[in-house]
From Swiss-Prot:
GO terms for biological process: hydrogen peroxide catabolic process. InterPro entries: Globin (IPR000971), Globin-like_sf (IPR009050), Globin/Proto (IPR012292), Hemoglobin_b (IPR002337), Hemoglobin_oxygen_transport (IPR050056). Heme b binds at H63, H92. Residues 2-146 form the Globin domain. It holds the Pfam family Globin. It comes from the Eukaryota. The gene is HBB. PROSITE patterns: GLOBIN. Displays a pronounced Bohr effect despite the lack of the His at position 146 conserved in the beta subunit in most other vertebrates. Shows chloride-dependent sensitivity to organophosphates like ATP and 2,3-diphosphoglycerate (DPG) but not to inositol hexaphosphate (IHP). Binds molecular CO(2), not bicarbonate as reported for other crocodilians. Involved in oxygen transport from the lung to the various peripheral tissues. Red blood cells. It comes from Paleosuchus palpebrosus. This is Hemoglobin subunit beta.
Amino acid sequence: SPFSAHEEKLILDLWAKVNVAACGGDALSRLLIIYPWKRRYFEHFGKMATDQDVLHNEKIQEHGKKVLASFGEAVKHLDNIQGHFAHLSKLHYEKFHVDCENFKLLGNIIIVVLGMHHPKEFTMETHAAFQKLARHVAAALSVEYY
């Protein structure tokens, strides 16, 4: 594992408290509000003309939950993140044609959201551990691109 035992504990302890639906919906909504041109990937999700549309779009909330649940799978596979995300990398590259830069952007937004939802637990050490995790997840999802 690229993570020390201490980093793994920090990640697992915080993750046990995460509300995946709330944080996932929040993270994906933020991505689409901060970077509105990213909405083109989700045009089939219905109305997203305004920020309020994005915030109240059930399909965005649902997909955000799915995305964060997938991020949570990395937490369960800290010793083999790349292997675990091989299929998703291929899918995003071949089928969805998602720019791999989005994985880094969303990873950073997930970190912001975790900090907002868990301000007391989100110490600098925990932040650093999750930043490392987000880097590894983004790299694993980008494998097919290079």
